[in-house]
């Protein structure tokens, strides 16, 4: 299937799900989800995978159901559809998401396991690799990206208070994101070019994460 844009009811579907996150709503609108959201997302990922997947990772579209086993919010469905090409969480990721808010693209270290966090901080602590990451993130900010993540309020153990990259060392996850509100492009093939351009911009960040962090070697629970 060739990507031709998300369906005309894609945003409307998520507007409705935000208002009524229930199985009856889902069942009544399942055909819309499949045709206007899921199928186009799979087609989008299939067209991007040949450029961004080889030597990096496999791609997948996330399942729509939430894991509510330990969540206070028992809403059964995610209010977005996300897809990713990643080599195990934390070691770099190309991410795209559709929701009622529009389109979002991202990249970087969304989740860092303990061994990945140790390698991340070791790389940041090293002048050559730490300065390289600073330069990458500064360039992304200049081109409209937001740098986000979970960070400690204090310094991590083992590092000096005056470390030149203390702000980076505080991160327990760090990634770049940019968003587009719903517009005509979302429903056109030009949406593919929008995501491709964004992923190319974040490629240096992902390559840094691929080379310096890599996949977790911790046993899977």
Short names for language-model regions:
Residues 52-93:
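Hydrophobic/aromatic-rich structural module bridging two neighboring secondary-structure elements via a short loop
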Residues 10, 15-65:
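Active-site acidic/histidine clusters and adjacent loop/turn architecture
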Residues 95-97, 165-166:
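Short, surface-exposed charged micro-motifs
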Residues 49-67, 120-123, 127-135:
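Short, intrinsically disordered, low-complexity segments enriched in Ser/Thr and Pro
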Residues 101-159:
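Compact, glycine/acidic-enriched structural inserts
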Residues 37, 66-68, 85-89, 100, ...:
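Short, flexible loop/turn elements at secondary-structure junctions
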Residues 1-16, 40, 52, 143-221:
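Long, solvent-exposed, polar/charged low-complexity segments
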Residues 81, 92-94, 103-105, 172:
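Generic beta-strand structural signal
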């Amino acid at each position: 299937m060739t990507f031709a844009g998300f369906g005309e009811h894609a945003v409307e579907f998520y507007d409705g799900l935000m208002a009524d996150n229930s199985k009856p709503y889902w069942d009544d609108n399942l055909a819309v989800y499949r045709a206007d959201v899921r199928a186009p997302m799979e087609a989008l990922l299939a067209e991007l995978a040949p450029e961004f997947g080889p030597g990096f990772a496999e791609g997948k579209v996330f399942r729509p159901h939430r894991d509510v086993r330990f969540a206070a919010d028992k809403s059964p469905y995610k209010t977005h559809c996300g897809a990713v090409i990643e080599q195990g969480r934390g070691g770099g990721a190309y991410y795209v998401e559709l929701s009622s808010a529009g389109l979002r693209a991202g990249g970087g270290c969304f989740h860092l396991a303990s061994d990945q966090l140790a390698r991340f901080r070791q790389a940041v602590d090293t002048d050559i690799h730490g300065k390289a990451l600073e330069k990458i993130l500064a360039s992304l900010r200049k081109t409209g990206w937001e740098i986000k993540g979970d960070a400690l309020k204090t310094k991590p153990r083992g590092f000096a208070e005056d470390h030149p990259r203390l702000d980076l060392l505080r991160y327990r996850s760090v990634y770049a994101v940019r968003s587009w509100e719903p517009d005509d492009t979302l429903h056109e093939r030009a949406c593919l070019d929008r995501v491709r351009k964004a992923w190319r911009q974040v490629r240096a960040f992902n390559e840094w994460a691929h080379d310096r962090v890599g996949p977790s070697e911790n046993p899977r629970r």
